[in-house]
Amino acid sequence: MRGMPLNSMKLFRITDVMRRKVRHIHFVGIGGIGMSGIAEVLLNLGYTVSGSDLRTSDTTEHLSSLGATVFQGHKASNLTDVDVVVTSTAVRKDNPEVLEAHRRSVPVIPRAEMLAELLKMKVSIAVSGSHGKTTTTSMIATVMASGGLDPTMVIGGKLGSIGSNARMGHGEFIVAEADESDGSFLKLSPSLAVITNIDREHLDFYRGIEDIKDAFLQFANIVPFYGSAVLCLDDPHIKTILSDIKRKTITYGMEPAADYRAQELRFNGAVTEYELYYRTECLGSVTLSVPGMFNVYNSLATVAVARELDMTFPDIQQGLKSYVGVGRRLEVKGKIAGVTVVDDYGHHPTEISATLAAARQVWKNRMIVVFQPHRYTRTQALFREFLGAFTEADLLIVTDIYPASEDPIEGVTAEALCDGIRSLTRREVRYIPNFSDITDYLMTVVQPGDTVITQGAGSVNSVGVSLLSRLKEVEDSRAA
């Protein structure tokens, strides 16, 4: 960071107290994308790691291969001689492992508290925001790695270049995603804090937008006096808190007043180009290998961070060009019989609109979207916003709400959402609750040139896997 004697800070600063007191760390819900990344870094640091999840997955198998003990299912007996138990927001308070930990007086801490300990290791960059955290974190990590900084990274998605959502680097930096969903990101104390945007999200925890804005304001002010907050000046809610931030601020966006700006934007399929300005100085051209206006914003945040770390602009250019995306963010899963299958994690109306606009930039023919709403509380709170989020879809299929440990709310259903969307569009909207029935239906309607997007944070991506498998069977039978 500019002005900081980084060469003198090349020490692992994870506290000596933690190393003396804690050897065995247990994760309840270890297969979750946020939990597994922390677990992987701790394994690389030499800690004994165990954990449990309701089902095994590629993620749990990967952790097992690194030395973790992973249990399928949650049982009190899964807790052996553990020193601390880490939980995610999806874990209920009556979870048997949590109850057993309390019975034994073993500390039970949220994921963010353990992440905070990891951030003490090195000079830390934490990326927050209602949308775009994972992509921006992975883009920053890619650029830093490309420039030879060899960062430690903890990301909320699988980065294709490393095949994982975490990596233990040998450099002096750590870059991590900061999840604001339950307010626990305020336990972090990064040297650089990024806020991509502020929106009405996680309304099961926050009382409203003012409450959300206050949390992000606290996050910006949590950085040390020598640190900085990197913020998107185009975001209207960020503008309202800017004057209350007491730390150095670096802004980006299209606004003329932003420190870093993108001008002369050019979109060509999956490739985006623009001229980058720092205040009045044109630094040069930027080429992105990923589509969408949201990725322009993500890249501007990345540039701001990289320049604070004294990276050269040619290194930044090369790193941005080499970035090809992160798992479950407009991820192409395959193309068979002329049908392209894409998966995207976006589950908030703002994210969905941006994702489908970016998809339209790349795929010009018929777009079929299979959407699985995520959480009853979100569907209820943002019902009206969801109604207008699918304007780019030529055919929309909505399946049942993914509960994510929530109990149903009376009247909040996928059928009601379908009815609302139908009232605003002439395009076809179908409610199909069963995944296998969705695949069967798709097999009757897909044509060469179609793009099928599975949209949502739950399990809807399995529909894409099934569709590709069925298409492959048909293709093979025709070739026989």
Swiss-Prot record:
The keyword Manganese does not apply. ATP binds at residues 129-135. It is found in: Cytoplasm. GO terms for molecular function: ATP binding; UDP-N-acetylmuramate-L-alanine ligase activity. It comes from the Bacteria. This is UDP-N-acetylmuramate--L-alanine ligase. The gene is murC. Its EC number is 6.3.2.8. Keywords: ATP-binding, Cell cycle, Cell division, Cell shape, Cell wall biogenesis/degradation, Cytoplasm, Ligase, Nucleotide-binding, Peptidoglycan synthesis. Belongs to the MurCDEF family. Pathway: Cell wall biogenesis; peptidoglycan biosynthesis. It is an enzyme of class 6 (ligase). Cell wall formation. Its main location: cytoplasm. Pfam families: Mur_ligase (PF01225), Mur_ligase_C (PF02875), Mur_ligase_M (PF08245). InterPro entries: Mur-like_cat_sf, Mur_ligase_C, Mur_ligase_C_dom_sf, Mur_ligase_cen, Mur_ligase_N, MurCDEF_pg_biosynth, UDP-N-AcMur_Ala_ligase_MurC. One of its GO terms (cellular component) is cytoplasm. It catalyses: UDP-N-acetyl-alpha-D-muramate + L-alanine + ATP = UDP-N-acetyl-alpha-D-muramoyl-L-alanine + ADP + phosphate + H(+). The lineage of its organism: Bacteria, Pseudomonadati, Thermodesulfobacteriota, Syntrophia, Syntrophales. One of its GO terms (biological process) is peptidoglycan biosynthetic process.
